[in-house]
From Swiss-Prot:
Lyase found in the keyword field: yes
Annotated protein name in UniProt: Putative lyase MJ0807
Positions in coiled-coil regions: none
Record bears the keyword Lyase: yes
Record-linked Pfam families: Rv2949c-like
Family: Belongs to the chorismate pyruvate-lyase type 2 family.
Alphabetized UniProt keyword annotations: Lyase
Gene3D superfamilies the record matches: Chorismate lyase-like (3.40.1410.10)
Length: 184
């Protein structure tokens, strides 16, 4: 039963990306970023061959929920605008809750690395895949001239509860340098 459900979710994501690609032609790396159920941080580090760093734009805690707005950068290139919402009440273990809270508040650590650091077994459920209209503020943060970019929203699930809800806008277009060497 579980395998069937996972297969259905995967097929829906595939179909959503294929449908989106017909109206907004996507780069292959955008398709991968939109559809992954793994770490975006890891994919960015592989694609851009450097460490992913976080620049926090805004952060606040309201009603025991952390709201964080960041730019993910590799080699100082802004690649992703992300907004995360972390309801701390969903982390039942007090020590873990405090450590995650400390990591989110005191350091510019990507969420993928926080999950890896604490060895959390999580899964991601994609809720939305589409295109975002980019205003001048976001164009400036992402150092892009594109007025529309790929966007997704997903939940990170830990122990059957939403650990985080994340919305990401991907600005990788025109920023990935292709290798020009050939292998003989």
């Amino acid at each position: 039963m579980q395998k069937t459900k996972l297969r259905l979710i995967f097929m829906i994501i595939y179909k959503e990306i294929a449908k989106l690609n017909k109206t907004f032609p996507l780069l292959n790396e955008e398709k991968i970023l939109l559809g992954t159920d793994g770490s975006v941080t890891n994919i960015l580090e592989i694609l851009f061959e450097g460490e992913c760093r976080v620049e926090t734009i805004n952060q606040k805690i309201v009603a025991n929920t952390n709201y964080r707005e960041v730019i993910l950068k590799v080699n100082n290139i802004p690649l992703v605008y992300a907004v995360s919402k972390t309801p701390f009440k969903n982390i039942e273990e007090e020590n873990l809750r405090e450590e995650i809270k400390r990591d989110l508040l005191s350091a510019d650590i990507p969420i993928g690395k926080i999950i890896r650091k604490h060895n959390l077994e999580t899964r991601r459920e994609i809720k939305y895949i589409g295109i975002a209209e980019i205003d001048d503020y976001l164009k400036s943060l992402l150092k892009t001239n594109y007025s529309r970019l790929p966007k997704r929203t997903y939940n990170i699930i830990y122990k059957n509860k939403v650990l985080m809800e994340i919305t990401e806008i991907f600005a990788v277009r025109g920023k990935l340098v292709k290798n020009t060497y050939s292998i003989d």
